[in-house]
């Protein structure tokens, strides 16, 4: 399958080391695109080794930038000259026992982080398109919603209505982040 993208400049992939974002980066590099990828800690080999290996295979290339979703302005350098922003950065915690503070662990980075990205887009005149990576959990919050799905095709009117900051906070935060 051929992956084509119409970009006259580099593109930004936030959270480039994440699972979905890494596959996107790989396909973009294979298509010859220059990718500006953001990672929270570019000195951590666990976060960047696989990205450097992708870049070596080309024909596109990756330039890594350190950025934090909650730090205003931290995406400015990474976004310079980019024409498309793929916002894929998002925390994801599988083990519920590791969720100490749903507001801090999910809501702030997902919702306020998305606001930060969109504000930086507004400040970057070269960006023409933003692609937000969301999740099915923005539509289906818990089992009750899965058991009573909307009829027909899903649309922008179909939202997760059962999650809250205290009940499935990841789903709630993804819903609120997408609603921006």
Model regions and ranges:
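N-terminal Rossmann NAD(P)H-binding glycine-rich loop of SDR-like oxidoreductase domains
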Residues: 3-35
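Conserved cofactor-binding/catalytic machinery of classical short-chain dehydrogenase/reductase
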Residues: 71, 113-116, 176-177
